[in-house]
Amino acid sequence: MEGILFLAKLPEAYAIFKPIIDVAPVIPVFFLLLAFVWQAAVGFR
């Protein structure tokens, strides 16, 4: 919870990193999809 409050009060200097912070939680899902596509490509050996 403190992390959310910290991110809400980010200094202006870090404003350019805000899109990266917004996208960060989605990255593990992309890895999961990548693993599935890879297994489909090799035929689920």
Curated annotation (Swiss-Prot):
Membrane-spanning intervals of the chain: 24-44
Main location: plastid
Keywords, sorted A to Z: Chloroplast, Membrane, Photosynthesis, Photosystem II, Plastid, Reaction center, Thylakoid, Transmembrane, Transmembrane helix
GO biological process: photosynthesis
PANTHER family: PHOTOSYSTEM II REACTION CENTER PROTEIN K, PTHR35325
Function: One of the components of the core complex of photosystem II (PSII). PSII is a light-driven water:plastoquinone oxidoreductase that uses light energy to abstract electrons from H(2)O, generating O(2) and a proton gradient subsequently used for ATP formation. It consists of a core antenna complex that captures photons, and an electron transfer chain that converts photonic excitation into a charge separation.
Annotated protein name in UniProt: Photosystem II reaction center protein K
Organism in which the protein naturally occurs: Guillardia theta
Source lineage: Eukaryota, Cryptophyceae, Pyrenomonadales, Geminigeraceae, Guillardia
